[in-house]
Every structure is written in structure tokens, then in C-alpha cells.
Amino acid sequence: MDSGRDFLTLHGLQDDEDLQALLKGSQLLKVKSSSWRRERFYKLQEDCKTIWQESRKVMRTPESQLFSIEDIQEVRMGHRTEGLEKFARDVPEDRCFSIVFKDQRNTLDLIAPSPADAQHWVLGLHKIIHHSGSMDQRQKLQHWIHSCLRKADKNKDNKMSFKELQNFLKELNIQVDDSYARKIFRECDHSQTDSLEDEEIEAFYKMLTQRVEIDRTFAEAAGSGETLSVDQLVTFLQHQQREEAAGPALALSLIERYEPSETAKAQRQMTKDGFLMYLLSADGSAFSLAHRRVYQDMGQPLSHYLVSSSHNTYLLEDQLAGPSSTEAYIRALCKGCRCLELDCWDGPNQEPIIYHGYTFTSKILFCDVLRAIRDYAFKASPYPVILSLENHCTLEQQRVMARHLHAILGPMLLNRPLDGVTNSLPSPEQLKGKILLKGKKLGGLLPPGGEGGPEATVVSDEDEAAEMEDEAVRSRVQHKPKEDKLRLAQELSDMVIYCKSVHFGGFSSPGTPGQAFYEMASFSENRALRLLQESGNGFVRHNVGHLSRIYPAGWRTDSSNYSPVEMWNGGCQIVALNFQTPGPEMDVYQGRFQDNGACGYVLKPAFLRDPNGTFNPRALAQGPWWARKRLNIRVISGQQLPKVNKNKNSIVDPKVTVEIHGVSRDVASRQTAVITNNGFNPWWDTEFAFEVVVPDLALIRFLVEDYDASSKNDFIGQSTIPLNSLKQGYRHVHLMSKNGDQHPSATLFVKISLQD
């Protein structure tokens, strides 16, 4: 039952010095402010999955003193968070480290007694995170179940009494009536000692993890045999999985990759265990493995791509009084975001600051944000990052901004047009590793050659902070001075190359040329929706050659989001959402940008790139986009669904909703029945049929909720997949958490077919 020892042995880490130090534990200084440093004991638990932290809170619970390795986003050495940068400058960097979590919770800033202790923690955690990520689905399942067994073994005798068995089933999120639990217990208790140990626990584990639906699927493919031959596997891949590359080569590679039995592998066969390993793997996922890498043409103009974009990136919470943080930029970049917003204002000591103007959100230094962007811009993707500047600074502080941009970003910053690219927007491929500024600019694309002098007066049209239309909102923000003119420093203007901010003056027409290719307008969600309603095709055609940025309405002071789908349907590229706010809008957003290797750029369909096209998302007619498909999805079962209530006795009642997002004609939703008291292996076996007419714009969202008859259902997990990335056949859908991180073991088992 020692899952930790199994983990260390599996990865050859049983004698690792760093991990032994973590298992022993150590006293560390926890830092919260300049006046709050407290010594606390931290220790890696034996399961190698959780960290125990000493707490002196009066209302502490055992659960509150633990955090999971799976919740860690990153471990940073030195003064590399706002907390340590502000409050631990007196301590050498080699003793400082930070644990950054995936969700919105605070970073854990720590000081070790010595550089060696800090190294043990940083290297040890890196090793566990790396090796946990490399575990296959079966290993994760085993590790998780063994961890639950260890928790249930209250007296730590490596045996399981009937009472401990009941606790174990609750840990697994399954409610079994006592008579059935007693029946399983007796079947496995071969020694008749009224407790399970060693092989008896293994027998119980096998009985628990047996999946009837996998047995049935395997029997369909193997007939009466105990294994699949290469020919049988090829037939399954062709007829059920609809794999384009189905053939002996693919079958043999799957056997080599997933078959655990060396005997079967040598005989070029796949056992049921190997079959399950394949179905749980990336090859058996409902999301196309080929689309997990960059596969699209990256050589087209920027305006031909959807761009993952964040609104008011600096905010961690609401738009009126929440905190601003450099961590928000890091989180967005790590999620593949390629367009960030910087709302710049004059700060004290001649240092520009970033915050949501006219509100009470906290303030951060412009230079600190640039350093965070420099360090993280290209960790998740090599393709260009666009910094959307909302500039409210005086000339003097604009020049400080320009100096910081030059000094901190250096050669990353694009500060002149690319050679030979002066008539159209460059491509993501041409701009790899580059950071572009979007903002006000004096003159045209090329340097003005002295025209206009060192500064000029231009109209500021993107003052989103002043767009607080609602009276209730206006009463809660600071008074906006009456000023609609901005004096722009030449030094800052010259750094804006291909993304010059302009007022939208209407679509181009004969005799009215409209915007230059390097000029772009921003639209509130409401204005964009009006343009789509009044001139859908005009907006689509405008977006073939020009970038358009969409941002949330001013009344969304709670940082809520609008649906990005309608904007994408109109060809809008920079559809900015509040990344800090989880919900269905961000689920769909993350699903769209999971495509093309999650690089932050997704090529628009051909009909949204045609300057003479006739597509209108609000008045759908026949055209090259019309490709009627019949989509059948059978939701068969769920696996290891997480608890939503921290109450240990609470078991989920899961239901699944399958949603279609796309053009209005394709939008649809279907629901399964509710399965009571079973989050471990619920069974639905329910089929849904959908008709989709514009598949290139459709996304499929699988939503799993805990049903509640008296209030709103609780979110359990979801996965959103572009229809063009959806694989056919028997597949596992790997569920994501509320914050967009993948659950380690939670899946749906489905069968998918897509026909013309």
C-alpha cells in the first residue's frame, strides 16, 4: 500500500538525496509581508503526492494543512515573485524560493536555512512534478488508488478492515451500500481474518478497477480470443477508430508503446491491459494527437489567425477594487496567451504604473511587468506576443516607458518593419520570438522623417477605463477628468510598427479606402455585435486584411466574460477575455486554442480569409463553409470524477451535458440522466445525435456536473474540443478543472461518429 515507495522505485528515485531531504522535512520561513515572517515545518508526505505544512491557525483542519503536488504550477528559485521581491531583499537569493499554484490562490514564498536546503526543495519538487507528468494514465490511476488506500488505513497496519474499506470507497467518491461492500470484502478475504492484506488488497483493487465497457469493446475487436492480433487491431483502427493511417505500421507502434506484456509484445499481440492503456493514452484521446503540435500553415498574414488574447491582464479579480499583479501576466503567458493588455498611468518617482484607471485596483510597476513578460513570453509558444498599450501617461513618463521597453525587452522588441514587409501584415512565422506593441502612432508605417516634431496631439479612443456606462458603476469609480487628447512621445510612437491603434471609420468601399493594413481598431463586445448584425459580411471581409480587437463591455466590473464564439464567427482575431475568470466562456476559449499545438495562433477557415467571400454568420446561406455533418456521441461511462465538496462524506451525483458551440444554427445541448452516489465509475450509455452545418466553426463541450435538486449544479469538470480536432471511435475525454488544468485521472469514455 506504499504508493510513495512505488513512485520512487518506478522512477529510480529511491536513493535520491533531494527527495530524501523532502521526506524528512525541514523548518522554513514563510513570508507574507515585511513584518510577517514565521517559521513553519514543511514535509513531503510518504505518498509523494502531497506536502504537509505546519499551521497554527485556531480553526485548522488536517486537510487545510496539506496541498497537492498536482496543484503546483511552478517552483521558482530566488526573488522571482512579487512577495520575495518586496519583502525578502535582505536575504540572499540562493536561500529563497517560491511555490506558485495553478489556481488563483496566493503564492507560497519561503526562505530556507541554507542554500543547500533551498536547492533540495527546488530540485526535489521539480523531479516529482516532472516524473508525475510523465506517468501514463494507468500509473496515475494506480498511484491515486494506493494513496486513497493509505488514507483509509487509519491504524497504518497495511491491512484493511471492513470499516477502512468503507472509508476507502468514500475517498474514491463512490457510495456503496453496506451489504454490497460486505459482499466484495468477503469475496476478497481469502484468509478469513476479517481484514484484507497483500494479495487480497490486490484482488480487491482488480475487482474495483475492472471496466465492463472496456471488456465489451475488447471482445468486439478480439472475438473469442484473449489477445488482439495485428490484423484485428488494424480492423479496429479502421472501422471503429476511423484512423486515416490505420495499417500494420500503426498497429505495431501502438503494441510497442502500450502493451505491458513482453510476451504478447514479442508475439505482435495486444492484451486487454494493453488495449486499455492505448485507450487511456493521448493516442486514444478524443482530442486529435496530431493537433497537439503546430500543424497549420504559419506563414500567412497575422490577420488570418485567431489570437489568444487577454483583457486587463494585470487583474487577478474584479475590475473595481481587486489586486493587480505581475503573476497575472505570467499565468496568461503560461496558458499560451499571445496578446496582453497594459493599462499605463503616471506613477510616483517618475515610474509608470499599471492599474485599472479611475478605480481602486492596486498598482504595479510598468518595468516589473516588462521583466515578467521578458522571462515568460516564449515559454509556452515561440510565436509573437502583442502588448496592447492603453497609454494615459504624460510625455515625460512615456519616455520612461520607451526606455524601459528598449532596455528590458531588448532584441525581442520589434522596433522597425521587417525587410520587405511593408505592404501587408507579416506572418507568425516571420515574427517568431518577437514582441510587438499595439498603440497610438504618429504618421504611417515607416518613420516620419522628422514630420510632426518630437511629439504630436492625437485623439485617445481606447479609454476602456472610462467606459463605465452603468450609473451604479460610475458611482463607485473615481471622477474622470474631462480630457480626450493625448500628447504622444515620438520615442514611444516609433516602437509601434504593425499594430497602430485607430478609430474605426467604417468598412472600405470603392472610393473609400478605409484603414491601412497596419492600422487596427478596438471594439467593445456590444459594438462588435451591432456590426455583425448590421453588416456581418462587411465585418468578415474587413477582418481578412485587418486586425480587430474585441474587449468586454464596461459594465462587466465583476470580470465576467462574453462568448467569444460569435466574434470568431465574424473573423475577429484578438477577442480579449478576462483570463482570471473561470466559466463556460473561458472553457470554450481554452478549447479553441488547444488546437495547433496550443501555440496561441489558430488559422481561420478559408472562407474567413477570402477578401471576396460572402460568408455572413448572422445570415447563413449556402457556400463553401456549408458542409452538413451528422455527429453521434455516445456517453458511455465516467472514471475517477473528483469530489466537489470538501465534506469527506459527500459523494457526487454526476450528469453529463454535451454542448455544440458555433454558428447559431448549430448551437445545441443534450443531457444524460443523473447517476446517484457514484463519482468513481458512473455508467450512462446514452447516445445523442446532432446536425452541424458549419463544422469549421463548431466546438464540442463535454460538461460534467454534480446534480443538486435544490440549487445550482456544481461543476465537476469539462473538456471543449474543436470539431475538426475531434477523433472518432471509442475515446476517452480527459476532463479539465474549473481553472483549466487537466485532472490527473478524471475521464469520460465515449463513442463518436461523424458522417456526411
Swiss-Prot record:
Q: In which tissues is it expressed?
A: Strongly expressed in lung, liver and heart. Also expressed at least in pancreas, kidney, skeletal muscle, placenta and brain.
Subunit architecture: Interacts with TGM2.
Q: Which GO terms describe its molecular function?
A: calcium ion binding; GTPase activating protein binding; phosphatidic acid binding; phosphatidylinositol-4,5-bisphosphate binding; phosphatidylinositol-4,5-bisphosphate phospholipase C activity; phosphatidylserine binding
Cite the binding residues for Ca(2+) 4.
651, 653, 677
GO BP: any one term: lipid catabolic process
Name the catalytic site residues: 311, 356
Where does the record place the PI-PLC Y-box domain? Answer: 492-609
| Recorded consequence of changing residue 381 to A | Decreases hydrolysis inositol phospholipids
**InterPro entries, alphabetized:** C2_dom, C2_domain_sf, EF-hand-dom_pair, EF_Hand_1_Ca_BS, EF_hand_dom, PH-like_dom_sf, PH_domain, PI-PLC_fam
The cross-references to SUPFAM superfamilies, in alphabetical order and at most eight, read: C2 domain (Calcium/lipid-binding domain, CaLB), EF-hand, PH domain-like, PLC-like phosphodiesterases
Which gene name belongs to this protein? Answer: PLCD1
Q: Which residues form the PH domain?
A: 21-130
Its name, as the record gives it, is 1-phosphatidylinositol 4,5-bisphosphate phosphodiesterase delta-1
- EC number(s) recorded for this UniProt protein: 3.1.4.11
- Where on the chain is Phosphothreonine found, per UniProt? 457
**Boundaries of every C2 domain copy:** 611-737
The record names the disease as: Nail disorder, non-syndromic congenital, 3: A nail disorder characterized by a white appearance of the nail plate (true leukonychia), the nail bed (pseudoleukonychia), or neither (apparent leukonychia). Leukonychia may involve all of the nail (leukonychia totalis) or only part of the nail (leukonychia partialis), or can appear as one or more transverse bands (leukonychia striata) or white spots (leukonychia punctata).
For the ligand (Ca(2+) 1), the binding residues are: 153, 155, 157, 159, 164
Which PROSITE patterns does the record cross-reference, listed alphabetically? C2 (PS50004), EF_HAND_1 (PS00018), EF_HAND_2 (PS50222), PH_DOMAIN (PS50003), PIPLC_X_DOMAIN (PS50007), PIPLC_Y_DOMAIN (PS50008)
